[in-house]
Amino acid sequence: MKYNQYAYVETDFQQQVKELIDINFLPKNYQVWDFSSLLAKLVKNAIAEAKTDAAKNAKLAEFAVSDHQTLADFLKEKPTEIGTKQFYNVALQLLGYHVHYDYDFADPTGFMQRNALPFLQDISDNQKLISAFYRLLNTRAKNGQILLDVMAGKGYFTQFWGQNKFKFFNGKSIPVFDTNKVIREVVYVETDLDTDHDGKSDLIQVTVFRPEETNKGLKVPALYTASPYFGGIIANEKRNHNVDENLSDSTEWNDPQYVHSPIVKAEKPDGSSRPATEEAVHKSSYPLNEYMLARGFASVFAGAIGTRGSDGVRITGAPEETESAAAVIEWLHGDRVAYTDRTRTVQTTADWCNGNIGMTGRSYLGTLQIAIATTGVKGLKTVVSEAAISSWYDYYREHGLVIAPEACQGEDLDLLAETCQSNLWDAGSYLKIKPEYDKMQKQLREKEDRNTGQYSDFWEARNYRHHADGIKCSWISVHGLNDWNVKPKNVYKIWQLVKKMPMKHHLFLHQGPHYNMNNLVSIDFTDLMNLWFVHELLGIENNAYNQWPTVMIQDNLQADKWHEEPDWSNDLGQEKIYYPTDEGELFQDGNGKAQKSFTDVGGIEFKKAGISESDWQYKFICGDEKWAKPSLRFETDEFTHPTTIVGRPEVKVRVSASLPKGEISVALVELGERQRLTATPKFLMHGGQELGYRFGTDTLQEFVPDKKTKAKLITKAHMNLQNFKDMKKPEAIDADKFYDLDFLLQPTYYTIPSGSKLALIIYSTDQGMTKRPLEDETYTIDLANTEIKFYEK
């Protein structure tokens, strides 16, 4: 598998020497060293676990330059040069590879080439030797980290603890901070909100992890993760909303309105500051933050209103949530007051922070990054938003229907608010908050309107995209192309806005579902983020803006292949329109004339079968007779060459329904029995990545070829028939009358291999996402007025 590397910054020899000397790897007087002595010195420096010269000398015998000579014996010969094979046999051993198991002595560079590991052809003098070691230190080891990070995990950089300054290597910050002395403290930031209606502004508990060196005058940036889950969650799966019910007449919609909570102006900072008096008991919960904390970046967590240690009630997705989370950045920037405890008597400032803040986090944590970025809050320099919601309507609704995130049937805004209302765990807080919490829950249940599923002012207040013009910070979005929890149109739609803005922006799309990507084999994402944060938050010019393409997309056939694109949109491909035939085929010249019908039975058979939603979906897309019966399927011939679908497919369907209401679902599926990638990354080296020195670990993982399957969902979408004219306004419809639907599917970037077919499936009830009616309904599709349009690359 290829260990692709994008974060290595090309560096001239003089700068290589400077950096190597700065980390005590290369002797300052290297010019007077002979080749043999310098080679021995550099190899021994790389053996970071050996702490004395005697121990390092003993270790040399554990390495071999060939199938008949150890490194120790080779050095005894006082060589004046080293062959490429000899050098990289040793290099691969330093990188954690095992001879005879991973590679052969006879061809180390062949192995490196196959795995996208860099190497130099000529190592015949001291200068070339130094450059070879510089590149080796920046080469990804078997555990996915560069060798320098592997050495850090063995204690190499403890020699610099206490020096009270950052150090950089190849444009990235290195772990020279004493992780045994990390300051872990809690403060309380005052907001301008009163969501619990007690007449006082809500306080937000903020947990800070920062280098001890900041107590000695060093100012550092902060990586802030706004996590409503940080204080714990209240499990409520058994109280999910019932989805086994008939569809309602959507004209009952009454456009529920959003109303902001009371404003209570917070105190202004008075210029005084005392140290925090409460120690943090929660641990940092995000490996990327921990990794950067060892490299000098403070890690800050806050759950915002309603979470444990904070005042207020949860109002999922509302402006109040955004405002309370943004208040933390205002404090870090010096613009808002915080106290040492909840008595509000002693102020404390973030005088250790340099005023530059970045944000990290996935899912809800990524969502709040988008929300806060739209406020243009001062101090926020960059966001790295993973699997984020850009409109809560697009999370819980679609085209006039109630739609569940994957594996969350029956969940909604009110239940997510309950899940995150962790301040109810503290008895004193419970007594104060519970009555206001109950009122807010009642409001959320009423206004989210599960009855009709329609867009409203309530949902408009939760659409961050409509405030995108407030974004001032640089931008990185990360999303899984197979994320059916936070569906891909959330990132696609915000990207279409961000890409037109002047600030620097990047997009990563991986093959996962609702997953992080910082520890994948196929890309050095953590190193890229190190480079990025150093540039954005420390102001170091390190070529970060030019280091990798604007859009990086992981291939769905080969996990170690990343497509480098200028954008993600329909413009990447050529428009193609496919039409169904009366015989169930799908062609560009299809000429279907018939009216084909199917009868949807809602969730009745699904409930009887007792299978999971994911099992149903696989059987359904494969064409299992029982589950495919309530649908129409149209298939292409086998593709004769690989074809990539890019952007958002669009479907047009002329349909009538036997009832004056209905829902239509459409799926695009790849058919063909073959090995496909695992749905989630496989763990390859559990706990194999050290985040610092004895400072936590992460696990190397990657998507790998799995057992053969018959089909793979590419994309899908759903629509309420009563929105045939307007996605934001329902109309009454008549039974047995045809209506034209025109809607977009989830965006994708999917390669159909030669030998596979493409299927268009038209159906109604999606057992995992839509409501599951208790009554039968017959749908008739007019094939002459039905088509699927997408863009091929």
UniProtKB/Swiss-Prot annotation:
Its EC number is 3.4.14.11. One of its GO terms (molecular function) is serine-type peptidase activity. Its main location: cytoplasm. One of its GO terms (cellular component) is cytoplasm. Gene3D superfamilies: 1.10.246.70, alpha/beta hydrolase, Galactose-binding domain-like. The active site is at S363 (charge relay system), D483 (charge relay system), H514 (charge relay system). Keywords: Aminopeptidase, Cytoplasm, Hydrolase, Protease, Serine protease. It is found in: Cytoplasm. GO terms for biological process: proteolysis. It catalyses: Hydrolyzes Xaa-Pro-|- bonds to release unblocked, N-terminal dipeptides from substrates including Ala-Pro-|-p-nitroanilide and (sequentially) Tyr-Pro-|-Phe-Pro-|-Gly-Pro-|-Ile. Removes N-terminal dipeptides sequentially from polypeptides having unsubstituted N-termini provided that the penultimate residue is proline. PANTHER family: COCE_NOND FAMILY, PUTATIVE (AFU_ORTHOLOGUE AFUA_7G00600)-RELATED, PEPTIDASE S9 PROLYL OLIGOPEPTIDASE. Homodimer. NCBIfam families: CocE_NonD, PRK05371.1-2. Belongs to the peptidase S15 family. This is Xaa-Pro dipeptidyl-peptidase. It comes from Lactobacillus helveticus (Lactobacillus suntoryeus). The lineage of its organism: Bacteria, Bacillati, Bacillota, Bacilli, Lactobacillales.
